[in-house]
Amino acid sequence: MDYLPIFVELKGRLVLLVGGGEVAARKATLLLRAGALLQVVAPELCSELQQRYQAGELEWYQGEFQPEYLDGIFLVIAATDDRILNHQVFSEADKRSILVNVVDDQVHCSFIFPSIIDRSPVLVAISSAGKAPVLARLIREKLEALLPSSLGTMAKIAGKWRERVKQRLTSMRQRRSFWEQAFNGRFAMLVANGQIQQAEKQLEQQLEQSDLQGELALVGAGPGDPGLLTLKGLQVIQQADVVLYDHLVSSDVLDLIRRDADKICVGKRAGNHSVSQEETNRLIVKFARQGKKVVRLKGGDPFIFGRGGEELQVAASAGIPFQVVPGITAAIGATAYAGIPLTHREHSQSITFITGHCREKGNELDWPALARGHQTLVIYMGTVKAALISHQLILHGRAEDTPVAVIGCGTRLEQQVLTGTLLELEQLAQQAPSPALLVVGEVAQLHHQIAWFGQQSIAKISRPAVVDFA
């Protein structure tokens, strides 16, 4: 972090603005809105600053900058087109440990101005640390569209009710849940519609019925890239009191969870169940009965080889309200990022998803059906059983030279795609980083032509594996 983002109280503080042109006028508008006692040093003032001076909104020292003008000053801005003068202002202010900003000269700044979204008393500040001001402006424009104009009014009402809520709800968790419900519910809608009295009545009713009920949200985290987490998924994990997450959830997605939420890893890996499913079920019920918002965060989609349905059955049996937020499953996300279309008119007319967590004999899968041509087979958690899968498919008629791909860390910056043939599947799987997805079918060869993300060089096995299942 190059800069510490802070909000500075300027009401009643002396601020010196050196410069009298249009740029200085824009800074003056911002400073006066923040309540600063503004002093301007310039030989002449532009029309806007002249009007403010005549209205008594600022003091004007007509003439050149003098170091003694810094006496008693809290903050300084140099906004002239004279570089030598700007550098002098910076030097004199810096010697006195006074915060100083030289417009469009980051080297001579002890602080910089962010892009601002003003929904007072709510303020959003966006900065690129001076590296990309246009990018910061574009981010601000996107956020402006997302944040309702009623946000400030909502915050003012909340401020008025804050002490009353604090007296009624003694724990921080209760208060947080109360306000989250208010800001996401009918209260917010009424404020947005300008129905302020009705909005306050809604708050009063909510406060009278403030007994907290726990709930469960089953959320799909997607395959790894945090940009593939759904908007609803992001909203839910940022409201959670407790997040029970799997190993497959990427660290980038975990970073999006609200900082004061309890994060508990209940992940299971092949051959190593660090937390049993029974213990996970117990934790869901335990925390929800404490009135907490519990998020069960699973890699990919929670209903595809994630045991999400079993966990919802437990919640339903315990009388715990729940919701499901789908996620982009690895078979969709990882193959897209690898440049492997799951269907193609010339190569594949159907898709089958299977899990590699199968018994050694492999009797539970319909291998003859899986071995048919002109289809794409995607195997989750198949690294350990890659040799068995390859053997069974070849045994039941799939050609040894069928193209395959193993996608390790799909959609993440460290993504690797290894391609080869079905006969080489075990060796490819052993080389790929975890988590890995196995793709069998002619579409795998299209990676060479339309790979677009991350490491596009292809690792390919040249010698076939020799596996004896006799």
UniProtKB/Swiss-Prot annotation:
SUPFAM superfamilies recorded: NAD(P)-binding Rossmann-fold domains (SSF51735), Siroheme synthase middle domains-like (SSF75615), Tetrapyrrole methylase (SSF53790)
Point out residues bearing the modification Phosphoserine. 128
Which positions are annotated as binding S-adenosyl-L-methionine? 223, 299-301, 304, 329-330, 381, 410
| Binding positions for NAD(+) per the UniProt entry | 22-23, 43-44
| Residue numbers annotated as active site | 246, 268
Q: Name one GO molecular function term.
A: precorrin-2 dehydrogenase activity
From the UniProt entry, list the residue stretches annotated as the region Precorrin-2 dehydrogenase /sirohydrochlorin ferrochelatase.
Answer: 1-203
Q: What is its EC number?
A: 2.1.1.107, 1.3.1.76, 4.99.1.4
Q: Which PROSITE patterns match?
A: SUMT_1, SUMT_2
Gene3D superfamilies, A to Z? Cobalt-precorrin-4 Transmethylase, Domain 1 (3.40.1010.10), Methyltransferase, Cobalt-precorrin-4 Transmethylase, Domain 2 (3.30.950.10), NAD(P)-binding Rossmann-like Domain (3.40.50.720), Sirohaem synthase, dimerisation domain (1.10.8.210), Siroheme synthase, domain 2 (3.30.160.110)
The reply to whether Ubl conjugation figures as a keyword in the UniProt entry is: no
Reaction(s) this enzyme catalyzes, per UniProt: uroporphyrinogen III + 2 S-adenosyl-L-methionine = precorrin-2 + 2 S-adenosyl-L-homocysteine + H(+); precorrin-2 + NAD(+) = sirohydrochlorin + NADH + 2 H(+); siroheme + 2 H(+) = sirohydrochlorin + Fe(2+)
Q: Where is this region: Uroporphyrinogen-III C-methyltransferase?
A: 214-470
GO BP terms in the entry = cobalamin biosynthetic process; methylation; siroheme biosynthetic process
Lyase recorded as keyword: yes
Pathway it works in:
Cofactor biosynthesis; adenosylcobalamin biosynthesis; precorrin-2 from uroporphyrinogen III: step 1/1; Cofactor biosynthesis; adenosylcobalamin biosynthesis; sirohydrochlorin from precorrin-2: step 1/1; Porphyrin-containing compound metabolism; siroheme biosynthesis; precorrin-2 from uroporphyrinogen III: step 1/1; Porphyrin-containing compound metabolism; siroheme biosynthesis; siroheme from sirohydrochlorin: step 1/1
In terms of Pfam families, this protein maps to: CysG_dimeriser, NAD_binding_7, Sirohm_synth_M, TP_methylase
Q: Which UniProt keywords apply?
A: Cobalamin biosynthesis, Lyase, Methyltransferase, Multifunctional enzyme, NAD, Oxidoreductase, Phosphoprotein, Porphyrin biosynthesis, S-adenosyl-L-methionine, Transferase
Top-level division of the source organism's lineage: Bacteria
InterPro entries linked to this entry? 4pyrrol_Mease (IPR000878), 4pyrrol_Methylase_sf (IPR035996), 4pyrrole_Mease_sub1 (IPR014777), 4pyrrole_Mease_sub2 (IPR014776), CobA/CysG_C (IPR006366), NAD(P)-bd_dom_sf (IPR036291), Siro_Cobalamin_biosynth (IPR050161), Sirohaem_synt_dimer_dom_sf (IPR037115)
Family recorded in the similarity comment: In the N-terminal section; belongs to the precorrin-2 dehydrogenase / sirohydrochlorin ferrochelatase family.
Q: What does this protein do?
A: Then it catalyzes the NAD-dependent ring dehydrogenation of precorrin-2 to yield sirohydrochlorin. Finally, it catalyzes the ferrochelation of sirohydrochlorin to yield siroheme.
| Alphabetical list of HAMAP family matching this protein | Siroheme_synth (MF_01646)
- Under which name does UniProt file this protein? Siroheme synthase
- What is the species listed in this Swiss-Prot or TrEMBL entry? Photorhabdus laumondii subsp. laumondii (strain DSM 15139 / CIP 105565 / TT01) (Photorhabdus luminescens subsp. laumondii)
